[in-house]
Amino acid sequence: MTFSVAIALLKDWSRMHYIQGMHPNVAKWIEIDRRLNETAPQKSEAWLKLRHGMLTASDAATALGCNKYEKPFDLLLKKCNLAPKFTGNDATRHGEKYEDEARIKFEQIHPELGKVWEFGVCQHPEYPFLGGSPDGVTEESNSLVEIKCPMMRDIGDGEVPEHYMPQVNSFFSFFLFVS
């Protein structure tokens, strides 16, 4: 059994990317997530509070200086509660609007991976200040799914924009430590 990350970069449904690799033992995380989802389902206030205290996979590109939309110092201010609360913008609202549709489309294009279940927060087992929330985990193949729905950019086949790679690599780090 392999473990992998699937990235659904959706402007055009036909362009989805599947990255192979990863550790086969995800059952432990799925069980932890089931318990967490009872108290902190994704996008809930409890989920936001858990994530706020962590440097998350979504923050990785900013922390490394690779995010053209946010500077590392702004991330520091945000984590210290010294920045205005981000309430979304057109791009994030667009992504949230189409995320469920993208998940369903991904399942249709990759039936061999099974159903994609939403996933809550996973905390790094060795460094609890690190965490992340993949957009889903597949039922049959124990693959993580990260969905991106860009508004205006055309994405070529096999192309994952560089600024998404720190987020994906963070997920690799978290799940390679599962025992």
Predicted regions located by residue number:
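Mg2+/Mn2+-dependent nuclease catalytic core
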Residues: 85, 90-96, 100-179
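Charged, glycine-rich intrinsically disordered N-terminal tails and low-complexity linkers that flank
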Residues: 1-97, 101, 109
